[in-house]
């Protein structure tokens, strides 16, 4: 799982999470749910010989109806430190990775056909999508999986997922 607006990243100080190593990278777990792993942004995991990076975060258009600190957190988008960690991890690999696991998409792949009518898109902070665009432009990758838009769609090597799930193409 990568973080989104409805979860606060475990590294932001919630003491219910433990950090541990999993497939070559760090993950967060909770004692009550030991089989649910929370990927740490910028960590690279070895999945049957394929390298995958986790990149969480996105802007919540419905945060006005959410409760701050309960169903929405202000740190929903990657911080400067997280962005730096992601870019450093990719830089160490020569900007080459097999799989990207992100919450939202690079801006160029946004599924505008499913945008909610009545939401003024000029007021939506797309800084994460713009940053992911810059990542995607520099990156050599095989497959990119993401969610956020509550739809199913494949565009080139990118797959937006919602109700569907798929075994990673390893």
Question: What label would you give each PLM region?
Answer:
Residues 35-37, 158:
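Short, conserved active-site loop motifs that form the nucleotide-linked donor/cofactor pocket
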Residues 41, 57, 69, 165, ...:
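Active-site donor-binding loop signature of nucleotide-sugar glycosyltransferases
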Residues 41-48, 154-156:
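Short acidic-hydrophobic surface loop/beta-edge motif
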Residues 11-29, 34, 47-127:
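Active-site-proximal loop/helix segment associated with metal-binding centers of metalloenzymes
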Residues 1-23, 107-170:
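Conserved beta-sheet core of the metallophosphoesterase superfamily
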Residues 1, 40-41, 55, 102-103, ...:
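Short His-Asn-centered micro-motif
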